[in-house]
A protein has these predicted regions:
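Short, solvent-exposed loop/turn positions at domain surfaces
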Residues: 230-231
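Glycosyltransferase specificity loop/lid
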Residues: 2-226, 235, 251, 260-273, ...
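Long, low-complexity segments enriched in small/aliphatic residues
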Residues: 236-253
């Protein structure tokens, strides 16, 4: 709760002005898939509501989001509904686990994100409605980079709220490649000379992908719809006033960061609930070695038989008991 209170203070500082009241009108642009991200934003919306702020979610038509007094829904005609988004995501996860090149799947996901962004920006009715709402702050999930575009079009301040993904090189954070492993490099902070060369190669490939494949998709969307004033997507990514990463330094390798990058892991923690009696007895019986909880989150619902069998075999070798959610 201390972390959540600090987060609310930071958001309040962003939206405060001498001529405005403390209550702010916030719009959140969650990704078109990954329901776990939406769960985090709902928790944030509840906390904002309790402090007197008003939160809106920009959600596609057909996406199942239960109503709540803590937030409002702004609907738009997107390319996915809840069922098709989940089917698409699980197919990507299955392909990755089957050995298909990860970056091919990521590019396909990116292509669907940009298609959806094109539909939103191109909807006169949706954009007019959002402009008339006069929001004070827009929260961007960096998985859904359209949030940067929408913040620019609406002319509102924006901050990034991420489950861990960010773009340190694009934001301006130093990345000494000798000890800062690149995302998806499968390296640690202790690298041999060959591994450092590999890390540098991964860094260059990813910078190429971001600057010449990912960001230009959104530049073309803004050019297509005549967005004024003109702005480069790279400048919009770098222009965020605050990056909030829902992870913890304990889970990261040491690396340089920036003053406006804040680690806020743990904001979803809450007092424990009592265990069912039979399960509590099972836990108490593990006093010697303890137990391990295995969970892949909401993004991974199905594992292939081969991978599940290998994981089960590895877990069976542990002295601890295992709870597989």
């Amino acid at each position: 709760m201390v972390l959540l209170s600090s987060l609310l203070f930071l958001l309040g500082f962003l939206t405060w002005s001498p001529s405005a009241s403390w209550a702010a009108k916030v719009i959140v642009v969650p990704p078109i898939m990954f329901e776990s991200h939406l769960y985090i934003f709902k928790t944030l919306a509840t906390a904002l509501h309790q402090e007197g702020h008003e939160t809106h979610f920009l959600i596609s038509e057909g996406r199942e989001v239960p109503p709540s007094p803590h937030y409002h829904l702004q609907r738009y005609p997107g390319i996915f509904n809840s069922s098709t988004a989940d089917s698409f995501l699980q197919s990507k996860v299955s392909n990755i686990f089957s050995g298909r090149l990860t970056f091919l799947e990521l590019f396909d996901i990116l292509d669907h994100y940009s298609q959806n962004c094109d539909a939103v920006v191109g909807s006169v009715e949706v954009m007019t409605r959002l402009k008339e709402a006069k929001f004070d702050l827009l929260l961007v999930d960096p998985n859904e980079m359209c949030g940067f575009v929408l913040a620019h079009i609406l002319g509102v301040q924006y901050a990034v709220f991420s489950t861990g993904l960010w773009y340190p090189a694009e934001v301006g954070a130093p990345a000494p490649l000798s000890y800062v492993p690149e995302f998806n490099s499968l390296l640690t902070d202790r690298m041999s000379l060959i591994q450092r060369i590999t890390n540098t190669a991964v860094y260059l490939v990813q910078r190429f992908g971001v600057h010449y494949i990912a960001l230009p998709k959104y530049d073309r969307i803004m050019k297509k719809h005549g967005v004024k004033p003109q702005a480069a997507m790279a400048d919009l990514v770098q222009g965020s006033r605050l990056w909030m990463l829902c992870t913890d330094m304990a889970l990261e390798f040491p690396r340089p960061t920036l003053p406006h990058v804040v680690y806020i892991g743990g904001i979803l923690t809450k007092p424990p609930s009592p265990l069912p009696q039979d399960f509590e007895a099972w836990v108490n019986d593990t006093a010697e070695h303890g137990f391990v909880v295995v969970s892949f989150g909401a993004g991974v619902k199905y594992l292939s038989h081969d991978i599940a069998y290998k994981l089960a075999g590895a877990l069976a070798r542990l002295p601890q008991r295992v709870v597989w959610r």
